């Protein structure tokens, strides 16, 4: 095996504990129509590690990075992952993994999660997480072109994008409110 073929087959892993600029831009809550097909997978384990793992698929309209080390996200309150995270966060043990494909790399981000208070009557369960550890993985011989993706139905596309923008605004307000209450810190 030659040196060049070894390099092509080698797994390149880039560890990070802050969002790289390309991911900050992905999770900045702007230009949601252009991020329509993006999907991230949130994997949540039961706090006692005895129950099944739960997975939620999240769009760019449900993810917001208020700073370089945090991620706010919204789930439907009836989702099992939301209920598990809420219970674990109340015990101080909320943990999840966010996985996704972006620009040819597979990302896996380990998160410490806390519940995020939102205005009364909000339709979503909101959370704030800090990056515990993360990495991006690529190989030289193959480029990931997509992970799980979706396409909005044309007759509902604008309504969904408008809803995403409202969700991001709720997350922004909740993060700002928490940050003020904590004296400027957004992370759990």
Give the residues covered by each predicted segment.
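Binding-site signature for planar aromatic cofactors or substrates
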Residues: 1-188
């Amino acid at each position: 095996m030659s040196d060049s073929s070894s390099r092509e087959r080698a797994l390149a892993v880039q560890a990070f504990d802050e969002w790289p600029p390309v991911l900050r831009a992905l999770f900045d809550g702007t230009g949601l129509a252009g991020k329509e097909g993006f999907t991230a997978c949130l994997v949540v384990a039961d706090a006692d590690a005895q129950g099944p793992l739960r997975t939620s698929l999240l769009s760019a309209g449900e993810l917001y990075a208020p700073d370089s080390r945090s991620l706010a996200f919204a789930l439907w309150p009836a989702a099992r992952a939301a209920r598990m995270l809420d219970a674990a966060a109340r015990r101080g043990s909320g943990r999840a993994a966010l996985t996704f494909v972006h620009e040819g790399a597979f990302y896996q981000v380990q998160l410490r999660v806390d519940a995020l208070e939102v205005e009364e009557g909000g339709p979503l369960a909101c959370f704030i997480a800090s990056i515990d550890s993360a990495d991006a993985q690529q190989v030289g011989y193959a480029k990931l072109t997509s992970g799980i993706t979706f396409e909005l139905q044309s007759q509902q596309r604008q309504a969904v994008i408008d809803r995403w923008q409202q969700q991001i605004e709720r997350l922004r307000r909740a993060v700002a409110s928490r940050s003020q209450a904590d004296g400027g810190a957004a992370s759990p």
